[in-house]
Amino acid sequence: HKAMAEIGVPPHQTAVISGIGCSSRLPHYMNTYGMNTIHGRAAAIATGCKVTNPELAVWQVSGDGDGLAIGGNHFIHANRRNINLNMILLNNRIYGLTKGQYSPTSPRGFVSKSSPYGTVEDPFQPAELCFGARGHFFARAVATDAAGTIEILKAAYNHKGASVCEILQNCVIFNNGTHDSVAKKEDRAKNAIYLE
């Protein structure tokens, strides 16, 4: 909300499109156009929204499971097409809404309900996926750093073309502490590198 207020685009010129998952209730809390779509299809629907109405500021919100598993193909092509679309990827490294299955960003060896002996796959790195699809803008922040998150969202909006903002979040129920190395202010100072 704060980033959008600082950007200054009126609500009637903004759309927030989401998929399914913990991230995806956001359109219901916004005083903008919005749609909570089906699993994995948020980037495709947001693309259609932007192409149909190019003057609309379109924000697409997905989680790591929604956006990179069933929606991975749409994520790739939204980056490749490079239309002026702002994609927010809320990454908690787990399927939290469906009660704790591993996601495309869960680390190798991660034990969950769907991987009782640990995952055998290496995780997707959203930045690599973005740039591999010829994306031009990628930024990452941690949800506990409100000022940093606001700054990357504003930078994404000001970028002309597709932008991806990965926001690292905690899931206190099924994956608590997953981003502790950067979530706490004192640790972030030691472990984070800020680039512009």
Q: What does each model-found stretch correspond to?
A:
Residues 2-9, 51-54, 80-84, 90-93, ...:
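Generic secondary-structure signature for well-ordered alpha-helical cores
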Residues 60-62, 137-142, 164:
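Short catalytic-loop micro-motif centered on adjacent basic/acidic residues
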Residues 55, 103-156:
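Conserved thiamine diphosphate
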Residues 33-34, 78, 103-107, 156, ...:
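Short, hinge-like loop/turn segments at secondary-structure boundaries
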Residues 20-22, 92-94, 145, 168-173:
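Glycine-rich beta-alpha junction loops
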Residues 171-196:
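Flexible, low-complexity linker and terminal segments
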Residues 37, 43-47, 51-117:
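A generic, well-ordered mixed alpha/beta core segment in the N-terminal half of proteins
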Residues 1-59:
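Thiamine diphosphate
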